[in-house]
């Protein structure tokens, strides 16, 4: 046998066939993928008083004290005569918070709920929401001139790469496997806050 042929055979022996990936390993690699990690995209805080006027202005002040941002007023979509609500009347105030401040306020709200939510608080799109009865439980000092207001928390989660769906130029859809489902949001809540979910399968 020539030296060239011997070298060729040795190379064949050295090359190993690729090892098959087991389903467990595939699941683990997806879990460890940084692109699969969840984060808070935004937190929306809403106070609905059901009427315009002084009560609504005071509710907006509560949101401003909590977030340091200027709230936006929401209008009624329909006329509800039984509640004296007119269409296009300002009846609620809301503010959108992002970044570290959103995480800080969310943790305060979950602490009021003792880090306990119901399965129905989570949507199939991976968002979740809950409410509290008294805003002073968030650490805001009670002001007799303002009163006490309850508020709703609405949390939108996202993954790295979600912004491509919102681009005006060269936008793209988020792949089905990359989308966030209810189970993803529930697991994120349990892992991040050591939370408890009551009711349902999750």
Curated annotation (Swiss-Prot):
Gene Ontology terms for molecular function: RNA binding; rRNA binding; structural constituent of ribosome
GO biological process terms held by the UniProt record: translation
Localization annotation: Nucleus; Cytoplasm
rRNA-binding among keywords: yes
UniProt entry keywords in alphabetical sequence: Cytoplasm, Nucleus, Ribonucleoprotein, Ribosomal protein, RNA-binding, rRNA-binding
Source species: Dictyostelium discoideum (Social amoeba)
Top-level taxonomy: Eukaryota, Amoebozoa, Evosea, Eumycetozoa, Dictyostelia
UniProt function note: Component of the ribosome, a large ribonucleoprotein complex responsible for the synthesis of proteins in the cell. The small ribosomal subunit (SSU) binds messenger RNAs (mRNAs) and translates the encoded message by selecting cognate aminoacyl-transfer RNA (tRNA) molecules. The large subunit (LSU) contains the ribosomal catalytic site termed the peptidyl transferase center (PTC), which catalyzes the formation of peptide bonds, thereby polymerizing the amino acids delivered by tRNAs into a polypeptide chain.
Subunit composition and interactions: Component of the large ribosomal subunit.
Bias (Low complexity) ranges: 1-17
Family indicated by similarity: Belongs to the universal ribosomal protein uL5 family.
Chief site of localization: nucleus
Pfam families hit by this protein: Ribosomal_L5 (PF00281), Ribosomal_L5_C (PF00673)
Name under which the protein is recorded: Large ribosomal subunit protein uL5
Region (Disordered): 1-30
GO CC annotation terms, alphabetical: cytosolic large ribosomal subunit; extracellular matrix; nucleus; phagocytic vesicle
PANTHER family: 60S RIBOSOMAL PROTEIN L11-RELATED
Keyword Cytoplasm: yes
């Amino acid at each position: 046998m020539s030296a060239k042929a011997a070298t060729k055979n040795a190379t064949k022996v050295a090359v190993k066939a690729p090892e098959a990936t087991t389903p467990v390993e595939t699941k683990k690699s997806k879990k460890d993928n940084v692109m699969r990690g969840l984060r808070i995209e935004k937190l929306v805080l809403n106070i609905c008083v059901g009427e315009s006027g002084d009560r609504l202005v005071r509710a907006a002040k509560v949101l401003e004290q909590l977030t340091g941002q200027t709230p936006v007023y929401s209008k009624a979509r329909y006329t509800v005569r039984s509640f004296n609500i007119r269409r296009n009347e300002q009846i609620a105030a809301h503010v959108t918070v992002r970044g570290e401040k959103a995480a800080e306020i969310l943790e305060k709200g979950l602490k009021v709920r003792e880090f306990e939510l119901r399965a129905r608080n989570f949507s199939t799109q991976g968002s979740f929401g809950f409410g509290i009865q008294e805003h002073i439980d968030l650490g805001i000092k009670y002001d007799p001139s303002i009163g006490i207001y309850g508020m709703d928390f609405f949390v939108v989660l996202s993954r790295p790469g979600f912004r491509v769906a919102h681009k005006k130029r060269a936008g793209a859809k988020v792949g089905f496997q990359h989308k966030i489902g209810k189970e993803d949001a529930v697991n994120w809540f349990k892992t991040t806050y050591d939370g408890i979910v009551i009711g349902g399968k999750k």
